[in-house]
């Protein structure tokens, strides 16, 4: 196991996306870059996102834009293709592995066809997507020394507390908790939105869990953030949790492979996307807990294997792909 609690950068390295403008990445990068967007019923957002990514491709920031569609019925695949992305149906990737079992499985299968030496996973339902969602993560890998894995953090505005009887409105311009300095003029949450309202499972489950059980990773603001960039060779050595636990599993497994010193986080400021209902969050929280418990069991820190842990795909490098 590579990861150990006592190594350099014990509190991690944090960057702001503005440190990695497109022209810097185009000038400094030495590796091919692929961007992958897993998508399900995202017709309203996927087109504009892909167009921005295609512009970055033309500017020399990246080389490949792939959308992995989950049999969407709203025209997601068609809009992504029209905007310039390569589109593959998730069920067509590694079909010998059986049915696709969620987002993590889709990411694992996508890795089998992505060509870049650096892979960046982004959300296809981001409502306020801008270039910096890609450049911040790609730049951290391409422009900084000794970085294998870059994870996003951001504010996820939720419903305003002012809308709740007795709730107190939150003034705009709240600072990012523990984040890097935000340049003047940077985007702030819209008036009437609670800047801390989103990411409920992250705040109530994932962060306390990591702080208690993996305290050397407690500096990571959002263990459940789905936006990451990583070296392909690293991703190919990792197992992939198939369900909601993929993000926290990836963070822990990257630590085991590379150590905390090669993990960084990047402040992307504000991320807006559709929120799930409270009832939908319970199975998510259960899966996150079971995924962490599985790793504790594998490490010998939990005697019994957890029940309900999602199926995991083996490291892609362990498969004989034809």
List the model feature ranges, each with a label.
Residues 69-78:
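A conserved acidic beta->alpha catalytic loop
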Residues 1-51:
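N-proximal low-complexity "stem/linker" segments adjacent to membrane-targeting elements
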Residues 51-62:
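Short, acidic, metal-binding catalytic loop of nucleotide-sugar glycosyltransferases
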Residues 1-12, 173, 179, 186-187, ...:
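Terminal low-complexity segments of carbohydrate-biosynthetic enzymes
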Residues 95-103, 129-167, 182-234:
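Acceptor/aglycone-binding surface of glycosyltransferases and processive sugar-polymer synthases
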Residues 119:
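Short aromatic/hydrophobic "clamp" motif used to bind/position activated sugar donors
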Residues 164-165, 188, 195-291:
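Conserved catalytic loops of nucleotide-sugar-dependent glycosyltransferases that act on lipid-linked
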Residues 32-34, 64, 249, 254:
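Cell-envelope/extracellular polymer assembly enzymes that use nucleotide-activated donors
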